[in-house]
Regions:
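Helix-to-loop junctions at the C-terminal end of transmembrane segments
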Residues: 51-61, 251-265
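Structural signature of the two symmetry-related core transmembrane helices
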Residues: 65-80, 267-282
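Juxtamembrane intracellular "pre-TM" segments in multi-pass secondary transporters
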Residues: 176-207
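Short amphipathic helix-loop junctions that connect adjacent transmembrane helices
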Residues: 20-33, 220-236
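Cytoplasmic helix-loop-helix junction between adjacent transmembrane helices
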Residues: 93-132
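C-terminal membrane-cytosol helix-exit motif in multi-pass small-molecule transporters
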Residues: 162-180, 371-376
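Helix-breaking motifs and short loop linkers at transmembrane-helix boundaries and internal kinks
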Residues: 30, 62, 83-88, 150, ...
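Residue-level signature of mid-helix packing/kink "hotspots" within the transmembrane helices
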Residues: 16, 44-52, 102, 135-136, ...
Length: 383
């Protein structure tokens, strides 16, 4: 398990390195706000379309080869991005990186292969910890490497490629072949009619989509808003994103596990949505950099409450026979939110107003909060 944790950490740090830089890189090459945020959408779309293919391939040739191919492809994608000289090359590099981003689902399948039921939660938690730490150190490192007066775009991207190369090396040397094999090949879409006919479960998945639609839209326009309103470059955006990552890790790493047994997932979800909504309202009102810490803390604390609690509630609400399918469809809803959210946010930023990605996100959260409050009562009555 240590090998998969170290490999994931190295790769996620690389991803985190380019996140604060990517919108500025697109603007540098003549993109408008919509084109800049669409870079997030095309990455997620490519990942969404190819994820089932990676699953079937890993069933056929094994988890380790697919993980190695994916990490190698990620390194090439970052190199391609570093060498990009126009917006078209940037788009092609991000699409290629999305296609090659099959390592996460395959790593989760690897954990399922090498652990028993008791150890699986710990293994998945280690992958989650790798993501949390990666999105603390990655943005801070990317911001630092980018510089302040003259922005160095290539160096952070080369470091990101190095992170994926380290992940490839660690996996090649330390990752052992699983003794057993849990198939990923069955399509989760066959469970969709059953999920639609289960109102509470279907509603939870719609909420999951809505949350990621709002949050991905906010993430994709944050740097653009900081550049436009607060005159911030990628260095400071990277530092602020690292702070946000710390807030998220504190919540998901400790607070959620303590609050859910006392309050239940549904109430924790409502609380998280209220935090998130407050952050979206406060963010466009900020006029000085230091005050940006407040809405970022609210947003990432809120998301830290909602995301694991919704996952847990979906898993617990689904019948055992369709639990895997329900979680698969929930992940598809997550991906669709990450595709459509940045596209809408970029359009709103460019065509309606720079604050509208956040105001519209708040408007979307209002019915989500109301539905969540109704679910609290329904779940309590069901018990």
């Amino acid at each position: 398990m240590l090998a998969i944790f170290l490999a994931a950490l190295a790769n996620v740090i690389g991803l985190g390195v380019i996140v604060p830089l990517l919108p500025y890189f697109a603007l540098h090459h003549g993109a408008g706000p919509l084109e800049a945020t669409a870079l997030f959408s095309v990455f997620s779309l490519a990942q969404f379309l190819t994820a089932p293919l990676w699953g079937r391939l890993s069933d056929k040739i094994g988890r380790k080869p697919v993980i190695l191919i994916s990490f190698g492809g990620s390194a090439l994608g970052y190199l391609w991005l570093a060498l990009a000289t126009d917006l078209q090359m940037i788009y092609l590099a991000r699409i290629f990186s999305g296609v090659m981003n099959g390592w996460l689902a395959t790593s989760q399948a690897y954990v399922a292969d090498v652990t028993d039921d008791e150890g699986r939660a710990k293994g998945m938690g280690m992958l989650g910890a790798a993501f949390g730490l990666g999105f603390i150190f990655g943005p801070a490192l990317g911001g630092y490497l980018a510089g302040e007066i003259v922005i160095n775009y290539q160096l952070p991207m080369l470091i990101a490629a190095g992170g994926s190369a380290i992940a490839l090396l660690v996996s090649a040397v330390l990752l052992r072949k699983p003794e057993r094999h849990v198939s990923q090949g069955v399509s989760t879409m066959r469970f969709l009619p059953q999920i639609i006919s289960t109102p509470i479960l279907f509603t939870l998945i719609i909420l999951y989509f809505g949350m990621f639609f709002v949050f991905a839209g906010m993430e994709s326009t944050l740097a653009l808003w900081c550049e436009r309103i607060l005159d911030m470059g990628p260095r400071h955006v990277g530092y602020y994103m690292a702070f946000a990552g710390i807030c998220g890790v504190i919540v998901q790493g400790g607070l959620v596990g303590r609050l859910v047994p006392r309050m239940g997932e549904a109430r924790v979800i409502v609380m998280g949505l209220l935090f998130t909504g407050a952050g979206l309202i406060v963010l466009p009102l900020v006029t000085e950099r230091i005050w940006l810490l407040l809405p970022l803390a609210l947003l990432f604390i809120g998301f830290g409450f909602v995301n694991p609690s919704l996952q847990s509630l979906i898993s617990r609400t689904a019948p055992v026979s369709m639990r895997g399918g329900a979680m698969g469809i929930a992940q598809s809803a997550n991906s669709l939110g990450r595709i459509l959210g940045p596209a809408w946010a970029g359009y709103a930023f460019a065509s309606i107003g720079v604050a509208w990605p956040f105001f519209s996100g708040t408007a979307i959260l209002v019915p989500i909060v109301l539905v969540s409050l109704i679910l609290v009562g329904q779940i309590r009555d069901a018990k």
